[in-house]
């Protein structure tokens, strides 16, 4: 009975130590690629930095002439040309490709189904919200009410009626039903 756990422990340690001591060539290949990339980048930066003026004598000599290759410029055709050693390299960032679209067409926020449902429910609530009343009560909108903006935002027709309904009418002239309704509303 004790032999089975001991054998399993022995096989597990053998597998663990055997895998740990085995050399993988993946790390060596990665190191080679990394060194090659770092070396080419260092050469490129050295070449570019030597083309820029570094001292006062270089600035007095005149501006350095920079060459822009057609394949470096975004949107141009990719024609193979000989590379010029002192050419300025224009790099186009990857995210600029997505920024070319018109900003107004792109919606911000998440694009999950739940967010879409929430946005739709919010729009439906805004369009069908009957509880809100965008108009203040008549007693507040009247010229005796508060706020210059409210008095200014009155429609001209209702402003004329309001002024006419408050003016004393001649006792002999019968009032129209609309004027009577407005007069009772103002009294309330």
UniProtKB/Swiss-Prot annotation:
This is Pro-adrenomedullin. GO terms for biological process: adenylate cyclase-activating G protein-coupled receptor signaling pathway; adrenomedullin receptor signaling pathway; branching involved in labyrinthine layer morphogenesis; cell population proliferation; developmental growth; G protein-coupled receptor internalization; heart development; negative regulation of vascular permeability. GO terms for cellular component: cytoplasm; extracellular space. PANTHER family: ADRENOMEDULLIN, ADM, PRO-ADRENOMEDULLIN. The modification Arginine amide is found at residue 41. Pfam families: Calc_CGRP_IAPP. Residues 131-177 are annotated as: Disordered. It is found in: Secreted. Disulfide bonds join 110-115. The lineage of its organism: Eukaryota, Metazoa, Chordata, Craniata, Vertebrata. Belongs to the adrenomedullin family. Keywords: Amidation, Cleavage on pair of basic residues, Disulfide bond, Hormone, Secreted, Signal. One of its GO terms (molecular function) is hormone activity. The modification Tyrosine amide is found at residue 146. Residues 45-92, 153-188 form a propeptide. Residues 1-21 form the signal peptide. Numerous actions have been reported most related to the physiologic control of fluid and electrolyte homeostasis. The gene is ADM. InterPro entries: Adrenomedullin-reg_peptide, Calcitonin/adrenomedullin, Pro-ADM. The record marks 116, 125 as: Required for CALCRL receptor interaction. Its main location: secreted.
């Amino acid at each position: 009975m004790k032999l089975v756990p001991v054998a399993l422990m022995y096989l597990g340690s053998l597998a663990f130590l055997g895998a740990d001591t085995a050399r993988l060539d993946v790390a060596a290949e990665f190191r080679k690629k990394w060194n090659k990339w770092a070396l080419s980048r260092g050469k490129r930066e050295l070449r570019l930095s030597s083309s820029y003026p570094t001292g006062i004598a270089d600035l007095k000599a005149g501006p350095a002439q920079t060459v822009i290759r057609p394949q470096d410029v975004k949107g141009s055709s990719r024609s193979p040309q000989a590379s010029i050693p002192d050419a300025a390299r224009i790099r186009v960032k990857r995210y600029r490709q997505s920024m070319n679209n018109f900003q107004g067409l792109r919606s911000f926020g998440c694009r999950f189904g739940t967010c879409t449902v929430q946005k739709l429910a919010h729009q439906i609530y805004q369009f069908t919200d009957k509880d809100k009343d965008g108009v203040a009560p008549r007693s507040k909108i009247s010229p005796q009410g508060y706020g210059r903006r409210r008095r200014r935002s009155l429609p001209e027709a209702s402003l004329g009626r309001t002024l006419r309904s408050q003016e004393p009418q001649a006792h002999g002239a019968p009032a129209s039903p609309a004027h009577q309704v407005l007069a009772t509303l103002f009294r309330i």
